[in-house]
Regions:
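N-terminal lobe of the biotin/lipoate ligase/transferase fold
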Residues: 1-95
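Short acidic-glycine loop/turn motifs at beta-strand connectors
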Residues: 39-40, 80-81, 125-127, 138-139, ...
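FAD-binding core of FAD-dependent oxidoreductases
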Residues: 72-85, 123-126, 134, 138-142
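A generic, well-ordered mixed alpha/beta core segment in the N-terminal half of proteins
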Residues: 85-135, 147
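Long, positively charged amphipathic alpha-helical accessory segments at protein N-termini or as interdomain linkers
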Residues: 131, 139-257, 297-341
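Internal helical hairpin/lid segments
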Residues: 231, 235, 241-290
């Protein structure tokens, strides 16, 4: 196999997400690409999330923060230059979420941190989250990406992100800040001083930059051990402008809003869902579904299925999703049916 490492100095989230998509669909048959990148002051939401509910959009605009939407599912995250993003890109056969996660865990051990996988897609150190993962697959092409919080501004997380009470309760925590940690706070003091220089004598910006670079190097070494081959460093190829424009567009980032007269919200084990129904008499004329679920294709399928259906429990329960749809789809239909008075 071939292990390709691509690092970029670009900090524009639209360009980076475009690069990630381009690399995904241009990976060779027996190639694992490790893409390492950072975004400057950015809120990134999942494929099916509602930006108006997940983020403080007005504050984001006022502060000149980027708002971006990715192709994968999951929840909203905040990126700054204290955060490192990674993406494992591979075709079916080589793509293995468990092995890729092991690379991250090994990289943490290489810099002196005992980390572990918890929940559906998080990594923790000392019981606190420092890395969240999400996934995308299409026709045999796949990516597994995530964040690694090295020294992210804790004050900016609650400033730009709105986290629902139900989500916090499901995690058993009181606030976003209480459930996350920066790895610079977890690296043993002597090791941190060696990596970043003494605190007080080196600027925080410089120390953070050195810590991020150390984690990048650790990830590369860990990937080489996991896959048993030497990494080949490569430059980022030219990314088509229309792909960059897609990620920067209002249409992609905010989506289409509909007028609605009914809204249903619920948190399942697999994630939260917000359902907006636009009614015409007794029938559903249109609908929008938002979710932080890791699934991506299910919600557009339900949006196509419901219009024209009578708002009646038996009619809704009689609908059939495409073959292969997950059980979560029928849980959503049951939820909508139960809302009928």
């Amino acid at each position: 196999m071939k292990l390709t490492v691509i690092r970029t100095d670009c900090t524009n989230p639209y360009d980076n997400l475009a690069a990630e998509e381009y690399l995904t669909f241009h990976a060779e048959e027996d190639e694992m690409i490790l893409f390492l990148w950072q975004n400057a002051h950015t809120v990134v939401i999942g494929k099916n999330q509602n930006p108006w509910r997940e983020c403080n959009v007005e504050q984001i605009k006022a502060d000149g923060v980027y708002l971006a939407r990715r192709m994968s599912g999951g929840g909203a995250v905040y990126h700054d230059m204290g955060n490192l993003n990674f993406t494992f890109i591979a075709r079916d056969g080589l793509y293995d979420i468990s092995r890729q996660t092991d690379v991250i865990l090994l990289a943490c051990r290489l810099i002196g941190i005992n980390a572990e996988k918890t929940g559906r897609n998080d990594l923790t150190a000392d019981g606190k989250k420092f890395s969240g993962h999400a996934y995308y697959s299409s026709h045999g092409f796949n990516y597994h990406h995530g964040t690694i919080m090295m020294n992210v501004s804790g004050d900016d997380l609650p400033r730009y992100l709105n986290v629902s009470e139900s989500k916090l309760q499901s995690k058993g925590v009181a606030s976003v800040k209480s459930r996350v940690t920066n790895l610079m706070d977890q690296i043993p003091e002597d090791r941190l001083k060696k990596i970043c220089g003494p605190e007080g004598k080196t600027s925080e910006k410089t120390r953070t930059k050195k810590a991020v670079r150390e984690m990048q190097d650790a990830l590369i070494r860990a990937a080489e051990r996991e896959y048993g081959c030497s990494a080949v460093q490569a430059d980022l190829p030219e990314i088509p402008q229309d792909l960059k424009d897609k990620y920067a567009s209002e249409e992609w980032r905010f989506g289409t809003r509909i007028p609605f007269s009914k809204m249903i919200e619920h948190r399942f084990d697999w994630g939260g869902v917000e359902i907006q129904l636009n009614m015409r008499g007794e029938y559903i004329e249109s609908c929008r579904l938002y979710s932080d679920s890791l699934e991506t294709d299910l919600f557009p399928q339900i949006e196509e299925l419901l219009p024209g259906c009578k708002y009646d429990a038996s009619e809704i329960l009689g609908l059939r999703l495409p073959q292969g749809a997950s059980a979560a789809g029928y849980e959503i239909l049951e939820l909508i049916a139960s809302s009928v008075e």
